[in-house]
A protein has these predicted regions:
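Residues at or immediately preceding the N-termini of alpha-helices
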Residues: 105, 215, 248-251
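ABC transporter nucleotide-binding domains
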Residues: 4, 11-205, 211
C-alpha cells in the first residue's frame, strides 16, 4: 500500500516551471529517496506535500485519501534551511514547539528528555541555541521533527553539516524510525546516501521525474555504462555525480562534452 502519492503535480513560479506533471508513489513503512541536483524541484514538491504551498494542478493523496489540512499533524518536516530561534533557550524552545504539535507539557518534557539524553545534549537544555555548535543545533532540530511521532517524516538534506560519526549516528536513528513503522521521505543530491538507507527512489531533474523504482532494481538496470565524476562546484566545493554514458558515443567525445559543463577532477567507471 502506498502511504503517499502525487499524481501529475504541476507548479509554476513567475513563468518558471518548477514541477512538470510529477508523480511519485511512497510505499508505507519505507524510506523513499527523493534524489536530484539543487534546483531540480525537490523542495517545491516537499512544500506541496506539507501544504506550505498548493499545486497549480495535480493531486496529493495521503494515506489513501486526498490531502487535507488535518494531515499536516501527521507530518514531521526537517527543512534544509533550519529555522530555530537563536536567542531562545534550547529546552524552552523544544517544549514550545512540541506543544504546537499537540503534546501536553508533561509528555513533551518526558519525550524530549529521552531524546536529549540519547543524543548526549541534555547538559545544553538551559543554554541559548546560539551557544550550540551547528551539529548540536541540527540534533535539536531533528528531535523536534520526530518528537510527536508522526506517520510521515520528511528529511531534506539531514546530514548537511554533520561530521561522518554524527552523520552515521543519524542514519541509524532514521533506520530505527523506519523499523518502528514510520514512512520516511529522504531528499538529497547524494546518490551514495540513497543507496545506503533507501528502499525506493525517484530522481527529479529539470522539474520532471526521470527515473523511479526500487533502489536495487534501479542500480542493476543502470549499472552498465555508469561513471562516477568528481566535479568542482561554482562555490568551490567538490560534488560526486553518477552519470550514464549515452550509447554510440566514444569516451573521449563524451568526456569532451562533459568538460564543457563541469570542471572534472576525477572520472571512474
Amino acid at each position: 500500500m502506498n502511504f503517499l502519492e502525487t499524481e501529475n503535480v504541476v507548479k509554476q513560479y513567475a513563468g518558471h516551471l518548477a514541477l512538470n506533471k510529477v508523480s511519485i508513489q511512497v510505499p508505507q513503512g519505507t524510506i523513499f529517496g527523493l534524489l536530484g541536483p539543487n534546483g531540480a524541484g525537490k523542495t517545491t514538491l516537499i512544500r506541496i506535500i506539507n501544504r506550505i504551498t498548493a499545486p497549480d494542478s495535480g493531486i496529493v493523496r495521503f494515506n489513501g485519501h486526498e490531502s487535507s489540512p488535518e494531515d499536516i499533524y501527521q507530518i514531521g518536516y526537517l527543512p534544509e534551511e533550519r529555522g530555530l530561534y537563536k536567542k531562545m533557550k534550547v529546552g524552552e524552545q523544544a517544549i514550545y514547539l512540541a506543544q504546537l504539535k499537540g503534546l501536553s507539557y508533561p509528555e513533551a518534557r518526558s519525550r524530549l528528555t529521552r531524546w536529549f539524553e540519547k543524543f548526549d545534549i541534555m547538559p545544553w537544555w538551559n543554554r541559548k541555541l546560539e551557544e550550540l555548535s551547528k551539529g548540536m543545533q541540527q540534533k535539536v532540530q531533528f528531535i523536534i521533527t520526530v518528537i510527536h511521532e508522526p506517520e510521515l517524516l520528511i528529511f531534506d538534506e539531514p546530514f548537511s553539516g554533520f561530521d561522518p560519526v554524527n552523520a552515521d549516528r543519524l542514519k541509524q536513528e532514521i533506520l530505527e524510525l523506519k523499523a518502528a513503522g514510520h514512512t520516511i521521505i529522504f531528499s538529497t543530491h547524494n546518490m551514495s546516501s540513497v543507496e545506503e538507507i533507501c528502499d525506493e527512489i525517484a530522481l527529479i531533474n529539470r522539474s520532471e521525474v526521470v527515473l523511479s523504482g526500487n533502489v536495487k532494481e534501479v542500480r542493476e538496470r543502470f549499472k552498465s555504462n555508469t561513471y562516477i565524476l568528481n566535479v568542482r562546484k561554482e562555490t568551490g566545493g567538490i560534488e560526486e555525480l553518477r552519470i550514464r554514458k549515452e550509447e554510440n558515443i566514444s569516451n573521449s567525445d563524451w568526456l569532451t562534452r562533459l568538460a564543457s559543463q563541469y570542471e572534472i577532477l576525477s572520472f571512474t567507471e
